Design a protein with these regions (language model features):
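Residues lining hydrophobic/aromatic ligand-binding pockets adjacent to catalytic sites
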Residues: 1-141
Length: 141
């Protein structure tokens, strides 16, 4: 991912920011959390890795998760810590995971809960309760 450059010849940043504003502008916690994401998405990052790392870092901060991000080039033993790298498969259905079952929370559209939309949906809709919702969503082995 460090080699993947971002094409700034397209206006993808403005399109994404307008899309987020359009979808979540009326969410209860939009005005509080959006200013954290806007400058990151407006900045011209040198590569996809830098953009993703900044977004991950701000999400963890907003979720009050003081997690140290360790970059590993190769898989290695990490002791007693839970290693889910092999469990996260982009093409697999997220709702089939043995370690996670989304806990319903109030959303903007419709009456039915739509799980696994995005961390933005969770933050904009429930604000400071987001960490609690995620903890409740973890399945215990």
């Amino acid at each position: 991912m460090r080699e993947v450059k971002i094409d700034y010849g397209q206006k993808w940043q403005a399109i994404h920011l307008r899309g987020i504003q359009s979808a979540y502008g009326k969410a209860p916690f939009f005005e509080y959390f959006f200013p954290y994401f806007q400058p990151i998405l407006e900045r011209q990052h040198s590569n996809l890795w830098d953009l993703n790392l900044q977004l991950l870092t701000i999400c963890l901060k907003l979720l009050r998760r003081p997690v140290k991000i360790t970059v590993l080039e190769n898989k290695e033993t990490i002791g007693e810590k839970v290693d889910l790298r092999g469990q996260i498969v982009p093409k697999g259905a997220f709702y089939n995971r043995s370690y996670y079952q989304a806990t319903p929370y109030p959303q903007l559209f419709g009456l039915d809960f739509e799980p696994n939309l995005s961390i933005l949906d969770l933050l904009f809709c429930v604000g400071p309760e987001a960490e609690k919702v995620l903890k409740q969503s973890l399945k215990k082995p």
